Amino acid sequence: DEPEYAEAIREYQLKYGKI
């Protein structure tokens, strides 16, 4: 079970590559 912000983090990684 992922937190709701996990989806935003995935989009961030798609845009920027890594955190």
UniProtKB/Swiss-Prot annotation:
- Note accompanying the cofactor annotation: Adopts alpha-helical conformations in the presence of divalent cations and is unstructured in the absence of divalent cations.
- Keywords per UniProt: Calcium, Gamma-carboxyglutamic acid, Hydroxylation, Ion channel impairing toxin, Ionotropic glutamate receptor inhibitor, Magnesium, Metal-binding, Neurotoxin, Postsynaptic neurotoxin, Secreted, Toxin
Q: Which residues carry this modification: 4-hydroxyproline?
A: 3
Q: Which cofactor does it need?
A: Ca(2+); Mg(2+)
Q: Which residues carry this modification: 4-carboxyglutamate?
A: 4, 7, 11
User: Predominant location of this chain?
Assistant: secreted
Give the note.
The mature peptide does not contain cysteine residue.
According to UniProt, the name of this protein is Conantokin-Pr2
Species for this entry: Conus parius
